[in-house]
């Protein structure tokens, strides 16, 4: 997810359940995240998707069955990267399924027009938020979609993806949706992680069984 890393609580919990089931886990940081902070590659959608495709190709070279776990914008990126070679199953935590709507809303909040972004290519606000024209055009051309068996855990208090957008995505893509009444977008409190663990236990048992 945005400003997260491969060592965050959600990923650590996922890895624990996966290893207990006898699976192996590949986890990596997006550009400008975790161990990749301070390097030259920008965290744009095209770059993130390209990186994810490389990891995906590596996974398929080494294992016959490959599942997917993604969080927030990482879930969107993973779905875009694997569109032509879908996973056996996907588990998504707080996925940003309406990425275009979210970016447009943030731009309106910050007083940035599409015309200004197209002209500049990149705009950084006073608080550090960075907008890329490459992202704006990419998400317009690549709406979130999934064609594999997909389970989603979503917080009822999520302020980045509205419930109506989530329900529309679930219906259109025939996903399984679990809503946590105690959670917002970022699952990190003890209550959040308890819900997440119960969800992971259920999903792991269903796939392993």
Question: What are the functions of these language-model segments?
Answer:
Residues 70-78:
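Gly/Ala-rich beta-loop-alpha elbow adjacent to hydrolase catalytic centers
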Residues 3-15, 164:
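The serine-hydrolase catalytic nucleophile loop
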Residues 18, 81-82:
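Aromatic pocket-lining residues of Rossmann-like dinucleotide-binding sites
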Residues 85-168, 172-179, 183-209:
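The alpha/beta-hydrolase serine catalytic core
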Residues 33-62:
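Catalytic nucleophile-loop/oxyanion-hole region of alpha/beta-hydrolase
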């Amino acid at each position: 997810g945005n400003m997260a890393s491969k060592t965050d609580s959600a990923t650590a919990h996922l890895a624990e359940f996966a290893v207990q089931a006898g699976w192996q886990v590949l986890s990596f940081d997006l550009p400008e995240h975790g161990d990749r902070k301070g390097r030259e590659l920008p965290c744009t959608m095209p770059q993130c998707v390209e990186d994810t495709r490389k990891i995906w190709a590596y996974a398929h070279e080494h294992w016959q069955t490959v599942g997917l776990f993604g969080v927030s914008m990482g879930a969107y990126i993973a779905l875009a990267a694997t569109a032509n070679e879908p996973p056996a199953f996907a588990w998504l935590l707080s996925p940003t399924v309406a990425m275009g709507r979210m970016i447009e809303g943030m731009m309106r909040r910050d007083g940035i027009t599409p015309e200004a972004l197209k002209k500049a290519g990149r705009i950084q606000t006073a608080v550090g938020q960075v907008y890329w024209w490459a992202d704006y055009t990419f998400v317009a051309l690549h709406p979130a979609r999934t064609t594999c068996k997909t389970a989603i855990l979503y917080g009822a208090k999520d302020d980045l993806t509205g419930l109506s957008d989530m329900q529309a995505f679930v219906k259109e893509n025939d996903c399984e949706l679990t809503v946590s009444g105690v959670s917002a977008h970022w699952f990190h409190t003890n209550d959040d992680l308890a819900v997440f663990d119960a969800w992971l236990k259920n999903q792991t048992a269903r796939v392993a069984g």
